[in-house]
């Protein structure tokens, strides 16, 4: 099976990809979306969102990275796909699934699910423009409101000759509600269409991954939010590893401070780590206590100091446990 680290705008940036691919056996990653409007974007935009382009389109640990584009104009999507390919992108992914209101209001992301013909035009333009050896894939939801629309949408992607398709098994209207997941539609898509598929949505552990594979008949899975809830989720899903214990998560939080300070977002670190806690709290009850100690801190150094103190307390408490 394959497990892919999916895109999350504003969350899974190159620093997080670097860290998570060091500790997981991911098959490839997808960047945050590059927003395409009516122009050819300068190189620095691609390098900012995918600095891995300067390393052979791989993370420092060697995991390939696809560049994701989001837009609705076939010509400019194709022009920017060409540019990403020229810069060395491992692959081009096209976002037709983002449910964010601002993106949809500007006719991007999931808004295109209402217009399968436009999806066809965008995918075909990009596939025709990019050299054949570079894969062009797409990411969709089941539809805007009606999951039955997925078949027409998938047909549009397949007819445009995309190399692969990720299906988030909810509609746009379904948001991220667990009750709205509909894996069985991916199985129906698989039976109707020959395009290689990746299943996405509600895979939080090994059992979920196996259930998704069993239901969909697809053995390639993409994880996004869960990869932040449980930092080693890739190995949990792929190899049935135990979830990372809390003390190792704390060590990872300290490693993340080094990534941010060393990287280009040191000034954003206080907000970034608090954002990560919003995910960790779903899997680790201890995260609530630690977040309470950090929430009022606004500078990097006090946060790092508090994390060190907290880690020392954990180690001291563990040392006092009876053998």
UniProtKB/Swiss-Prot annotation:
UniProt entry keywords in alphabetical sequence: Flavoprotein, FMN, NADP, Oxidoreductase, RNA-binding, tRNA processing, tRNA-binding
Residues annotated as catalytic: 98
Family in the record: Belongs to the Dus family. DusC subfamily.
Annotated signal sequence range: none
Function: Catalyzes the synthesis of 5,6-dihydrouridine (D), a modified base found in the D-loop of most tRNAs, via the reduction of the C5-C6 double bond in target uridines. Specifically modifies U16 in tRNAs.
EC nos: 1.3.1.-
Protein name per Swiss-Prot or TrEMBL: tRNA-dihydrouridine(16) synthase
GO MF, any single term: tRNA-dihydrouridine16 synthase activity
Annotated site residue numbers, Interacts with tRNA: 35, 95, 176, 272, 274, 279, 295
Cofactor(s) annotated in UniProt: FMN
InterPro entries: Aldolase_TIM (IPR013785), DUS-like_FMN-bd (IPR035587), DUS_fam (IPR001269), DusC (IPR032886), DusC_C (IPR042270), tRNA_hU_synthase_CS (IPR018517)
Gene3D superfamilies: Aldolase class I, Dihydrouridine synthase, C-terminal recognition domain
Coiled coil regions in record: none
């Amino acid at each position: 099976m394959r497990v892919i680290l999916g895109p999350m705008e504003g969350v899974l940036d190159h620093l997080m990809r670097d860290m998570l691919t060091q500790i997981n056996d991911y098959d490839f990653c997808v960047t945050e979306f590059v927003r395409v409007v009516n122009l050819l974007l300068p190189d620095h935009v691609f390098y900012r969102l995918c600095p891995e382009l300067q390393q052979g389109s791989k993370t420092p640990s060697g995991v390939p990275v696809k560049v994701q584009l989001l837009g609705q104009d076939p010509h400019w999507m194709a022009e920017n796909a060409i540019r990403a390919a020229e810069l060395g992108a491992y692959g081009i992914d096209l976002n037709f699934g983002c449910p964010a209101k601002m993106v949809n209001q500007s006719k991007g992301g999931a808004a295109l699910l209402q217009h399968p013909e436009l999806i066809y035009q965008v995918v075909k333009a990009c596939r025709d423009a990019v050299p054949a050896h570079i894969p062009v894939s797409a990411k969709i939801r089941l539809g805007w409101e009606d999951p039955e629309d997925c078949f027409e949408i998938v047909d549009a992607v397949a007819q445009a000759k995309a190399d692969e398709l990720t299906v988030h098994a909810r509609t746009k209207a379904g948001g991220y509600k667990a009750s709205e997941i509909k894996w069985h539609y991916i199985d129906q898509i698989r039976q109707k269409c020959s395009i290689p598929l990746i299943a996405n949505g509600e895979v939080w552990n090994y059992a979920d991954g196996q259930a998704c594979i069993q239901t969909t008949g697809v053995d390639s899975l993409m994880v996004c939010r869960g990869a932040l809830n449980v930092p080693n989720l890739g190995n949990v899903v792929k190899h049935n590893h135990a979830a990372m214990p809390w003390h190792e998560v704390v060590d990872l939080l300290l490693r993340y401070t080094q990534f941010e300070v060393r990287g280009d977002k040191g000034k954003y670190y206080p907000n970034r780590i608090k954002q990560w806690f919003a995910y960790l709290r779903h899997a680790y009850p201890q995260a609530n206590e630690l977040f309470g100690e950090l929430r009022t801190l606004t500078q990097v150094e006090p946060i790092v100091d508090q994390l060190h103190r907290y880690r020392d307390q954990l180690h001291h408490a563990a040392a006092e446990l009876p053998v």
